[in-house]
């Protein structure tokens, strides 16, 4: 179930900062038409940090209600109790799995990381994917912590965004007997990560070019690296443009530019600069996704 290209969904907002429910449904339909294998609401790209608890639950409810593909909901927090609350709600809502970010800001030691994830896994019987993103959390989850957690029955994988293919290789090497899934957390490293045994990507770019991301991942998983490399190099300039500023600022603007929901952001995120928007437009036009 947890393989392929899965967009980390954008959460569209109205101009008065409310959740754009119809926009969210429209965005989900768009990525599904592009062939994605699942969707991931309430992650970094979904501006989960500025969603209230009720909004967080509402976004997950909408995703489950309208999705035709598996839903993996972001339910992590730097507060174990809150992460547990979000995870219980997501399980009750009918998601297929949850994504749990490593606690951020408070930077727990290895014992704290193990206790945090084990407490949630023991309390809620649902497949769980860890999320290691040091650029956001302030710490890189150690390989030995990951391999210990891989032995917990319902911790089934990790989204790895440390930027190290070597680390991914080490995780796969040390969890080879645990049926543990590694998903890329960086669009640009998806192909190399699949080449060492990764199963796919939780992707920002799949919000904009779901067909191309799905095509690249599908080809790579089948061993057709010639086709996968061709798509990888085709979309690489757009991927770079989507990270000219803090994610999801460019991704939301790109979605708006190609006719999806509004790119309105919640503070403290602000619109991208005119110069960077011009670069983004150039890449969207090159790929033919924007007229």
UniProtKB/Swiss-Prot annotation:
Name of protein: 4-hydroxy-tetrahydrodipicolinate synthase
Binding residues annotated for pyruvate, in chain numbering: 45, 202
The protein's annotated pathway: Amino-acid biosynthesis; L-lysine biosynthesis via DAP pathway; (S)-tetrahydrodipicolinate from L-aspartate: step 3/4
Transmembrane segments: none
A single cellular component GO annotation: cytoplasm
InterPro entries noted in UniProt: Aldolase_TIM, DapA, DapA-like, Schiff_base-form_aldolases_AS, Schiff_base-form_aldolases_CS
Name of the coding gene: dapA
Gene3D superfamilies listed in its UniProt record: Aldolase class I
């Amino acid at each position: 179930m947890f393989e392929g290209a899965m967009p980390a969904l954008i959460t569209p907002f109205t101009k008065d900062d409310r959740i754009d429910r119809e926009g969210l449904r429209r965005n989900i339909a768009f990525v599904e038409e592009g062939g994605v294998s699942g969707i991931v609401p309430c992650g970094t790209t979904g501006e989960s940090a500025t969603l209230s608890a009720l909004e967080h639950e509402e976004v997950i409810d909408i995703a489950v209600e309208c999705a035709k593909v598996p839903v993996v909901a972001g339910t992590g927090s730097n507060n174990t109790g809150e992460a547990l609350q979000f995870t219980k709600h997501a399980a009750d809502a009918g998601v297929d799995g949850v994504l749990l970010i490593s606690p951020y800001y408070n930077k727990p030691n290895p014992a704290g990381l193990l206790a945090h994830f084990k407490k949630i896994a023991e309390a809620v019987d649902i497949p769980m994917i860890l999320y290691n993103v040091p650029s956001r959390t302030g710490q890189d989850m150690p390989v030995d912590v990951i391999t210990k957690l891989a032995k917990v029955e319902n911790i089934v994988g990790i989204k790895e965004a440390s930027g190290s293919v070597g680390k991914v290789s080490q995780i796969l090497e040390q969890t080879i007997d645990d049926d543990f899934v590694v998903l890329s957390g960086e669009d640009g490293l998806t192909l190399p990560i699949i080449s060492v045994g990764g199963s796919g990507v939780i992707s920002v770019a799949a919000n904009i070019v779901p067909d191309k991301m799905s095509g690249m991942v599908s080809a790579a998983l089948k061993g057709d690296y010639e086709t996968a490399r061709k798509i990888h190099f085709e979309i690489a300039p757009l991927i770079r443009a989507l990270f000219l500023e803090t994610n999801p600022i460019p991704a939301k603007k790109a979605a708006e530019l190609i006719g999806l929901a509004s790119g309105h952001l919640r503070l403290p995120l602000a619109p991208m600069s005119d110069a960077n928007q011009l670069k983004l437009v150039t890449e969207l036009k090159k790929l033919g996704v924007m007229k």
